[in-house]
């Protein structure tokens, strides 16, 4: 998993509340079990005017030329609600997004994002609105997300602090998923297993 320390990237916004996981990645695209290849289906029903995904919707923000290559998504409250599917953060990450900024997130989506290297940043409604206004006002507007200091820097230079559980912050800073976190304690695990063998003999 790629470590997340500080990232500056082009920002895109979807000014909608209660974006659920079926909107993020519709159920008909969930047959794959590997993490790659989901980005093309991200927000399928909004990005495309046809079921096959051949006709892009020019009104949808992710299809607009000014947002091409965006790596930070700004959205509204309760992002990632709905059914639990790890495919949702997979699709967002595969599309090229590194961080999602919103006033609140669904709990399961929040945890799945952290476990897959996607940083969910919760800011106040007013701060999110300011970010959206600045992104809309300036083509090419970039946002910086600094996980080392837990700050978001807006295109105009305004700084907003956010919080993240230290365990989640540690995993993201070091690029550790659940397996990687376990392997980081390999020496202690080996020592414990040796002790267990001694007790059993």
From Swiss-Prot:
MF terms in GO: 3-isopropylmalate dehydratase activity
EC number: 4.2.1.33
One Gene Ontology term from the biological process aspect of the record: L-leucine biosynthetic process
InterPro entries: 3-IsopropMal_deHydase_ssu (IPR004431), Aconitase/3IPM_dehydase_swvl (IPR015928), AconitaseA/IPMdHydase_ssu_swvl (IPR000573), IPMI_Swivel (IPR033940), LeuD (IPR050075)
Pathway: Amino-acid biosynthesis; L-leucine biosynthesis; L-leucine from 3-methyl-2-oxobutanoate: step 2/4
Catalysis performed (reactions): (2R,3S)-3-isopropylmalate = (2S)-2-isopropylmalate
CC annotations in GO: 3-isopropylmalate dehydratase complex
Claim: Lyase is one of the keywords in the record: yes
Quaternary structure, from the entry: Heterodimer of LeuC and LeuD.
Family as reported in the entry's similarity comment: Belongs to the LeuD family. LeuD type 1 subfamily.
Function in brief: Catalyzes the isomerization between 2-isopropylmalate and 3-isopropylmalate, via the formation of 2-isopropylmaleate.
Family matches, as NCBIfam families: leuD (TIGR00171), PRK01641.1 (NF002458)
Protein name (record): 3-isopropylmalate dehydratase small subunit
Protein source organism: Shewanella sp. (strain W3-18-1)
